[in-house]
Amino acid sequence: MTIQQQLDTYIVERRAQFEDLLGRMVEIPSISMDPSKASDMRRMADLAVEVLTGMGAESRIVETGGYPVVSGGWTAGVQYPTVTIYNHLDVQPAQEPEWKQEPFAFKNEGGMYRGRGATDDKGPALAALFGARFAIEQELPINIRFLWELEEEIGSPHFAAGLAKRAKIPRPDSVVVSDTIWIAKGQPAMPYGLRGLIGARLTLRTGSKDAHSGVTGGAARNPLAELMDVAQACVNAKTGEVKIPGFYKDVVQPTKEEIRSFLKSGFQVKRFKQAYGFHSIRTDDPAEVTRRIWAAPTFEIHGLTGGYHGPGVKTVVPGGGELKISMRLVPNQTPEKVFALFKKYVSKLNSDVKVIPEGMLHPFKGSFEGPYVECVKRAAKAGFGKEPAFIREGGSIGAVVTMQKAWHVPILFLGLSLPEHGYHAPNEYFDWGQASGGMKAFAHYFAELAKMGKR
């Protein structure tokens, strides 16, 4: 039996185990941003150790001052290359009314694995682990390490503290991150850049309580209207142009070569709109859409709270309100600098508005050339029959920049999720096709690294 036949057989034989472990992981509501889920976060860490140990790896919980990091893997020898695979096991909240099932009640519907965290990022984490187990069974000359974070969804505030414990989390020769989304089913995508992120809340209180609008309206200040006025002054809702003075000063536009690469990726505007349920978007030009979602900064409004939200209309002037916003940044922009510009501008617009930061992540830009990239190309083709497209990722992963600063090693991406899987959305799912292809791709990637040797 050839190695390829052995791998195919291995994947089929391991399917039930994969599904069982994914179900157990999904059913733990590991919502890092919810303080009431602290005990569930600890349960998630304990299960992660159990999963790694059950696969024959050594594993440990690394305390950080916040939620821990789980580290584990296999060591063949210091003379061999070491690769670290990064995933996260914390998830987004799941309170949307559109859910068709209990979000943390795992469902396996013929190879479609439904539940919060199935694709972001528990399914891909397990697929990589199963690929690694096959590589170890082949006795490849390679050290494979896993790093599973529990604070990615809140900006990785304590991840650096975990990396600082070098005896427990050794420095690798390279890193692979499996926490990204393809352009479309059938077209693997390898990002070489990530946008940064600033989250903030803008609060304004103009009274101690809500007041009757018929009695006080016209004289009373309306905090929701004033917050909307601030929002309108920050971003053009029709074009998306950010109006904060100095916001674009450090932005470096993508090169013509990058834009050509974006267009070669197979990106289709129609498919993009269908995948995310959009009726219309700001432009239908493929080059401009890809530039906007992968290589341009943004200002987004996520919510406005205050006043009355029940049925009908309650005629009150709210006593206070809160606006939730974020800004995505591109390489060369600095979150601290942009936040200072934003805070100064808001103070000028309305000095009574308080700006409360909710985390900052730096942008990242790597390379789409070199020997490690070639390994990813061959691995993706082996797993999915097609080489990956090289794009930038519009989202943010705080741990990536932290690893780059701490280790100064190549960081590659081998994501397994699809747009329709529903990252951060109701009715999230993962599927066996992506899981099995991922196992195959990772097994090939480890073989490629072993062949390349220590560099």
Write out the residue ranges for each language-model feature.
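Acidic/histidine-rich catalytic neighborhood of metal-dependent amide-processing enzymes
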Residues: 121-193, 454
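Active-site metal-coordination/substrate-binding segment of hydrolases
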Residues: 80-148, 437
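An extended, acidic, His-containing surface patch that forms the Zn2+-binding/catalytic region
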Residues: 156, 184-185, 243-320, 331-341, ...
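Acidic, glycine-rich active-site loops and adjacent beta-strand->loop/helix elements
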Residues: 89-91, 112, 147-156, 178-182, ...
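A short core secondary-structure module
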Residues: 217-239
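N-terminal helical capping/dimerization or prosegment-like subdomains
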Residues: 2-96, 320, 324
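Flexible glycine/proline-rich, aromatic-decorated loop/lid segments
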Residues: 191-205, 412
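A common structural junction motif
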Residues: 89-90, 234-239, 343-352
